[in-house]
């Protein structure tokens, strides 16, 4: 075997090993990749039941219904479409109507999104990038952030507060 053919075989073997490693990495990650969709995309694209994804938008005013055993039903909207959501568990402290949220779960055959987790925005100006991009694409984005904080929202601790104190809920 010539030197050139040995080098070519070595390069081909390294390429095959890299391709195999990349294939294994992608197959391992396929179960953990979750796509983001807005309510308008869910309505227009016809997401198959059982598909896992993240749903982002605003909690529709007047849609929150609390049931027994921490069951909560609400609707998520992007002003173009609305998706009903069912969730069982404790909601974040910042969850409220008109609030930007991202919920992760699956869509059932009846078009109801069954959420496993619900995340609320962190402060008055925070909006998940995917939600902001979807609102911008639909021409619904308003510069300057969100709404004012509600009167019952937690206030930041004063500068002279000691570390030992706990906030009351």
From Swiss-Prot:
Residues where heme binds: 122, 126
Keywords: Cell inner membrane, Cell membrane, Cytochrome c-type biogenesis, Heme, Iron, Membrane, Metal-binding, Signal-anchor, Transmembrane, Transmembrane helix
Biased composition, class Basic and acidic residues, residue ranges: 145-154
GO BP annotations, alphabetical order: cytochrome complex assembly
Topological relation to the membrane, as annotated: Single-pass type II membrane protein
Positions in the Periplasmic compartment: 29-169
Cytoplasmic topology ranges: 1-7
Keyword match Nucleotide-binding: no
UniProt-recorded Gene Ontology molecular function terms: heme binding; metal ion binding
InterPro entries: CcmE, CcmE-like_sf, NA-bd_OB-fold
Chain intervals for the UniProt region annotation (Disordered): 135-169
Compartment(s): Cell inner membrane
Segments traversing the membrane: 8-28
Matches recorded under HAMAP family: CcmE
Function as written in the Swiss-Prot or TrEMBL entry: Heme chaperone required for the biogenesis of c-type cytochromes. Transiently binds heme delivered by CcmC and transfers the heme to apo-cytochromes in a process facilitated by CcmF and CcmH.
Family to which this protein belongs: Belongs to the CcmE/CycJ family.
The protein's name: Cytochrome c-type biogenesis protein CcmE
Species for this entry: Methylorubrum populi (strain ATCC BAA-705 / NCIMB 13946 / BJ001) (Methylobacterium populi)
Gene, per the UniProt record: ccmE
């Amino acid at each position: 075997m010539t030197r050139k053919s040995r080098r070519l075989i070595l390069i081909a073997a390294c390429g095959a090993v890299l391709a195999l490693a990349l294939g294994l990495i992608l197959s391992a990650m396929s179960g953990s990749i979750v796509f983001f969709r807005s309510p308008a995309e869910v309505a227009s694209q016809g997401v198959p039941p059982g598909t896992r994804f993240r749903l982002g938008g605003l909690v529709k005013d007047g849609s929150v219904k609390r049931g027994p055993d921490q069951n909560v039903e609400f609707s998520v909207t992007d002003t173009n479409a609305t998706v009903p959501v069912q969730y069982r568990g404790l909601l974040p402290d910042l969850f409220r109507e008109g609030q930007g949220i991202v919920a992760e779960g699956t869509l059932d055959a009846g078009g109801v999104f069954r959420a496993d987790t619900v995340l609320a925005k962190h402060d008055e100006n925070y909006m998940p990038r995917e939600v902001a991009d979807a609102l911008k694409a639909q021409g619904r984005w308003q510069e300057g952030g969100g709404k004012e904080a509600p009167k019952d929202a937690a206030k930041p601790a004063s500068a002279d507060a000691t570390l030992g104190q706990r906030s009351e809920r």
